[in-house]
Amino acid sequence: MPDAKELLHSNLHEVFSERDPERRRAASERTYTEDVRFIDPEGEFVGRQAVRDQAQKLLDGVLAGFVFEEDGPPYVGTDTAALAWRFGPPGNPVARGIDILTIRDGRVSVVRTLVSAPETDV
């Protein structure tokens, strides 16, 4: 059974960063419960396929060189874990956020993604 740090890694790198649909599918089977809920600023999506679809939509909308990079250490509780990330060309992110996972029976049952607000001049 994977631990919280492994689930954080898998969610970010093996699902949301993975451009190969078959490898993403295999990772999602290992990482998420069947009824996983993914909640981000665009809405709430339920089920492994819905998570895979959101990952594909994200990757389809950016340049091939964009990557997710961890942006700090993982934070781990008894049934929750969190990881900050940055996204964009390596070393030059265009977005930052944090994934907060709820873990049930060794798999992720909820992914809450918070995205930093765009910086604006005041």
Language-model features: locations:
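Domain-scale activation on soluble regions of proteins
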Residues: 2-5, 45, 52, 108
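A solvent-exposed, acidic/Ser-Thr-rich amphipathic alpha-helical stretch
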Residues: 25-77
